Amino acid sequence: MPTVSMRDMLQAGVHFGHQTRYWNPKMGKYIFGARNKIHIINLEHTVPAFNEALAIVKQLGSQKKKVLFVGTKRAAQKSIKEQAERSNMPFVSHRWLGGMLTNYKTIRASIRRYRELETQSQDGTFEKLTKKEALVRTRIMEKLEKSIGGIKDMGGLPDALFIIDVEHERIAIQEANKLGIPVIGVVDTNSDPAGVDYVIPGNDDAIRAIKLYATAVADACIEGAADSASVPNKDEFVEEKAADAE
C-alpha cells in the first residue's frame, strides 16, 4: 500500500502552516508551535492521518468506486488534473459549480451537451457550419470542458471527495455533507475542519506539498484498481470450480 513518510512531508514543506494571526483555534491540536510568526504543523498527526486516508482510498479503488479530486485554486489545478487523469478518477480543477453534487440532474444535462459538441467537433459537423456558428459552438464546448470536462465520465455521484484547501472548497464540502459523501481534506492552520470526515493537517499552498498529496492519493487509487482486477469475480470462480469437477 502506498504510504508517505515524515521525511517526504518535511521535504515537501507540509509542516509549514499560515501566519499565526490567521490561525483557526479548531486546528490548535495539530499545531506543534510557531517559527517566525508561522505556525508549524505537527507531522506526528499528519503522517498517520494521511496514511489512514490512503488506505480508505485504496479500498474504494478496489471496489471500483469513484474518488472526486477537487482543487480549484491556481496552486492546485495542475496536480489535481494530472493525478486524477493518471488514476482514471474524476476531477474539478477550475470553478466548482454550485449544485455539482446536489443538483446532479442539471449537471448531467450539461455533460450530455458537452459530449454532443465534442462528437460534432470530431465528426466534421463543425466544418459544415458557418464560421460564426462553428465559433459559437467551439466556445460553448471549451467553456463546458473547463467546468465539467473532468467529471464527464463520472457516471453518477462520486463515492468520496479528496479536497485541497477546504476553506476554498467550502461549497463542495457542504454539498458532500448534505448527500452523506465522505470528505478527505487537506486542512491548513487557517481553516475550519468542520464537515471534513478525514482531516489531513497540512500546508495547502505549497505546490510541492500539493503534488505530494495528489500523487499519493492517485497511487492509492491505482493500487486499489489493480487489486480489483487481480481478484476473479464470483462467476469466474464458479466456472473454474465446475471445470475442475469435470
UniProtKB/Swiss-Prot annotation:
GO terms for MF: structural constituent of ribosome
GO cellular component: cytosolic small ribosomal subunit
Parts of the chain that traverse the membrane: none
CDD domains, sorted: RPS2
InterPro entries xref list: Ribosomal_uS2 (IPR001865), Ribosomal_uS2_bac/mit/plastid (IPR005706), Ribosomal_uS2_CS (IPR018130), Ribosomal_uS2_flav_dom_sf (IPR023591)
Coiled coil regions in record: none
Pfam families assigned to the protein according to its UniProt record, in alphabetical order: Ribosomal_S2
GO biological process: translation
Alphabetized UniProt keyword annotations: Ribonucleoprotein, Ribosomal protein
Span of the signal peptide: none
Protein family according to the UniProt entry: Belongs to the universal ribosomal protein uS2 family.
NCBIfam families: rpsB_bact
Name of the protein: Small ribosomal subunit protein uS2
Organism: Saccharophagus degradans (strain 2-40 / ATCC 43961 / DSM 17024)
